[in-house]
Amino acid sequence: MPLGANKVALFGVAGVSTGTAVLLSTATASSSSSLSFTLPTAYKQVTFGFYNITPATDGTTFEFQTSTDGGSSYGMTITSTNFVATHGEDGSNGRIEYVTAGDLAQSTSYQPLGLYVGSDSDESIAGELNLINPSSTTYVKHFYGKFNNYTSSVYTRNPYVAGYVNSTSDVDAINFKMASGNIATGTVKMWGIK
């Protein structure tokens, strides 16, 4: 969901440039164990839009990891931070907090994007993740994202996650999955931004 002059790309079709963003790929989950994308080399930024991603397992975590071998394996070293604003449907427990369960410190685990995602028919997670210069062989790969999810305990959670993949290797694939169970439904779109 690129902002500014790139907004028009939200309505584009794969491979058609509308401004500086190009919609490159769309993946739709249907009881999928994960959704993977091959990352392009021609873009300084890759942006992912997530639309109503619903888990099969109630209260699980939506997460990602990257690869340097075309997706044969996922487990690159990540350091990250994670904080969230939360508010209940009944007006209770409005707060902003750091989420230690959502950060990584030089870990090869999957990076959490949203915790406690609900699996009811009206529950899901939606948002945006930006990966900076994934094909660089000079710099680490910075990422930052913002999401909102309707939790299994009828709260809205608005997580913000940022960090870096601590590698100067070309990152060429990314994988999104739930920590437990399949992705029941939802769509992910990938844009390249020059």
Task: Walk through the language-model features, giving the residues of each.
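Surface-exposed molecular-recognition determinants
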Residues: 2-194
